[in-house]
Amino acid sequence: MTNSIRIGTRKSPLALIQTNLVIQQIKQFFPDINCEIVPIITSGDLIQNKPLYDIGGKALFLKEIEQALLDKKIDLAVHSLKDVPGRIPEELVIAAILEREDPRDVFVCLNYKSIEELPQNAVIGSSAVRRKAFIQKIRSDLKVTVFRGNIDSRIKKLMTAEVDATILAYAGLKRLRAFNPEYCHLIEYSQMLPCIGQGVIAVEIRQDDNAMLEICNQINHLPTFELIKPERAFLEYLDANCRTPIAAYSKYLDADNIQTDFMLGNLDCSKIIFHTEVTDINTSKEAGIKAAKMMLNQLDK
């Protein structure tokens, strides 16, 4: 067993908090291992003035970190699973998942408590086409404008009235201790399905690194690992990018069965399809692929 681990992560406050959550899990099982955090600036962090879909998608938050992993400059990487594309380099693997935080979205607004309450033609700041699709479904009059940056910077922009409202993930707000019920309002799943993998912290390693695999096997939260399989299979089959409105949310019906709600839209968000699959744990990945095939056919009609 190794005595030291180099852990690659983005430099944002949220990324560092999430990395420390992983370290806490490692220390529970391997208290004598030294964990060194290696902050890495990614292309996604550097380019803030353009929508992700114009510059390469969420993979830009992983590119430099995964390269450091491939170059053996780090031993494992910590990501928000929602930023991980359906397909990753074949030499790498998502080997551990931490227990999922509440994956719901949050409506953040100083003067109103819901999207429905916003005045006519109000402006919502969001760069996610998934959120744009749901916003337009709820209120077609609203304007959605590009709104990037970390959680703190987005809330500051909201406070200075650059936009009327924004939408953020609850998990990030909670981990940063930035969820304020005075202006943060949870959005139910029935109104807005989460991003695939939202609320989940993922650990990525090299496929052939047995020492890291042993550690990941210990810290992996198996119920969550199984739960996100249909979501990830759906994403992988579609090979979706940041231009595609796509969402999925899985939950346990009982110890052996999973229900997954899927959403897929066309590029201009004018057509949105929903579908639900119920499957046992052993076939949940196949359910995600089945849903992707069926919904893709419906979208093309």
Curated annotation (Swiss-Prot):
Keywords: Porphyrin biosynthesis, Transferase. One of its GO terms (biological process) is protoporphyrinogen IX biosynthetic process. It comes from the Bacteria. Its EC number is 2.5.1.61. The keyword Transport does not apply. InterPro entries: HemC, Porphobilin_deaminase_cofac_BS, Porphobilin_deaminase_N, Porphobilinogen_deaminase_C, Porphobilinogen_deaminase_C_sf. GO terms for molecular function: hydroxymethylbilane synthase activity. Pathway: Porphyrin-containing compound metabolism; protoporphyrin-IX biosynthesis; coproporphyrinogen-III from 5-aminolevulinate: step 2/4. The modification S-(dipyrrolylmethanemethyl)cysteine is found at residue 242. Its cofactor is dipyrromethane. Binds 1 dipyrromethane group covalently. The keyword Transferase applies. PROSITE patterns: PORPHOBILINOGEN_DEAM. It is an enzyme of class 2 (transferase). It catalyses: 4 porphobilinogen + H2O = hydroxymethylbilane + 4 NH4(+). One of its GO terms (cellular component) is cytoplasm. The porphobilinogen subunits are added to the dipyrromethane group. PANTHER family: PORPHOBILINOGEN DEAMINASE (PTHR11557:SF0). Belongs to the HMBS family. Tetrapolymerization of the monopyrrole PBG into the hydroxymethylbilane pre-uroporphyrinogen in several discrete steps. This is Porphobilinogen deaminase. The lineage of its organism: Bacteria, Pseudomonadati, Pseudomonadota, Alphaproteobacteria, Rickettsiales. The gene is hemC.
